[in-house]
Amino acid sequence: MAKVKFFKTNSAWGLEREVNEFIQNKNVINISYTVAECGYGYIHCCCVLYRE
């Protein structure tokens, strides 16, 4: 069964580190990434679809 993990941060570098640590030893199906401008900066979001 597939699972989804959602990440959100205000740092692209922090998001990349978190996602890279998470996907180790996972069977990744898809990774989607988006960035949105907010009044105070940017929000970086990533959604990982995977199987354990």
Q: Residues of each region from the PLM?
A:
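Generic structural motif recognizing short loop/turn segments at the entrances and edges of beta-strands
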Residues: 1-3, 25-31, 45
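A solvent-exposed interaction/effector surface
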Residues: 34-41
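Short linear sequence elements within intrinsically disordered, low-complexity coil regions
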Residues: 11-12, 27, 38, 47
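A short, charged, amphipathic alpha-helix used as a generic interaction element across diverse proteins
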Residues: 13-34
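Short amphipathic
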Residues: 2-10
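Acidic, metal-ligating active-site segments
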Residues: 41-52
